Structure formats: C-alpha cells, structure tokens
A protein has these predicted regions:
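Acetyl-CoA-dependent GNAT
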Residues: 3, 7, 11-15, 22-34, ...
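Conserved acetyl-CoA-binding loop-helix of GNAT-fold acetyltransferases
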Residues: 96-99, 105-118, 141, 145
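Conserved active-site alpha-helix within GNAT-family acetyltransferase domains
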Residues: 110, 122, 134-152
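Conserved GNAT acetyl-CoA-binding A-motif
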Residues: 120-131
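Residues that form or flank phosphate/diphosphate-binding pockets in enzymes
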Residues: 89, 107, 138
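Conserved beta-strand-loop-alpha-helix junction that forms the acyl-donor binding cleft
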Residues: 104, 129-139, 156-159
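Amphipathic alpha-helical recognition patches that constitute DNA-binding helices
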Residues: 19, 93, 138
C-alpha cells in the first residue's frame, strides 16, 4: 500500500551526478541476480564512468533526467527520452527508474511517473514505454497502475 508524502520532482543538474551514479549502481546490484538482470545490465546499463554517462544525458536535448525528493533529500530518479518513430510519431521511453528501498511505497516513484507522463504529453508523444524484468511483479504492477501494458516479450537462450 502506498502512503503519500510530499514528494517533489525536479530536473536533475550537475550537482546530482554523484547521487545518480550511486543510485544507478544500487539499482543494478539489486537486479544483477534476478532472472534476466545480468543481460539487461550488459545490454542497457550505463558505461563507466557512470557520472559522465549521466552528464551526457543532462546535455541531450530530448532526454529528461528527473530527481524525486522527500523533504529536500534525493531518494529516486527517472530518465526518459522522447524518441522519433519511423511513422513520424514520438514515444517517451523510460530507460531508468529507481527509488531508494527505504523511500518506496510513499509515492515518490508515482510522482516521477506522473511527471514523465506530463513531459510525454507535452512533447506530443503517442505513448510511454518502460521495462520490467521477468518475474518482477512489483515493477510490472507499478507500471500497470499507470496504464502501461505489455506489448512485447523478449526471449533469450544462453549459448
């Protein structure tokens, strides 16, 4: 059950790079042993040095890096990019979403998603995409609570 607090969302700035990098590493360590986690990290993880990767994201015109705070303390982040589709339409793709485990269930992730959806609507996007690992029902249920539904399933076989 989510207990709402006064979470605030703001645009990330260069002073947030250490928080973003630490959060990214914590998020990856949490999924590394989950089904599909190691390959997801290898395919989609940010390259080292992670701080430089986030700095590049801050400078990208169509990428939005958001910080979720509680009482002025950063506790989560979201990275999303407005991408051009072959049809000429745009979609907002969430590549990173992480909230510190001690700050989960209080509404920060929800506020990050609501802000991302506002940005997507403002950019004229036809939809918003995000990923959840197989078996990660908490993440899947979180995204479904915002109306996101599975539209594809990736399959893999290790060789």
């Amino acid at each position: 059950m989510t207990t709402s607090v006064d979470a605030s969302i703001r645009v990330a700035e260069t002073g947030d790079l250490a928080f973003l990098a630490e959060s990214h590493r914590l998020g990856h360590s949490a999924i590394a042993n989950a089904r599909g986690g190691d390959l997801d990290i290898a395919l989609r993880g940010r390259p080292e040095p992670i701080e430089e990767s986030f700095a590049a994201s801050l400078d990208e015109e169509h990428t939005h890096v958001l910080i979720g705070e509680v009482a002025g303390v950063p506790v989560g982040y979201l990275v999303g990019t407005v991408e051009l589709l072959r049809t000429g339409d745009h979609i907002f793709r969430v590549s990173d979403l992480w909230v510190h485990p001690n700050a989960r269930g209080i509404g920060t992730g929800g506020e990050l998603m609501r802000k991302a959806m506002d940005i997507a609507r403002g950019a004229g996007c036809i939809g918003i995409d995000a990923r959840a690992l197989p078996g990660d029902r908490v993440t899947k249920n979180f995204f479904e609570s915002f109306g996101l539904v599975a539209r594809t399933i990736e399959v893999h076989k290790s060789l």
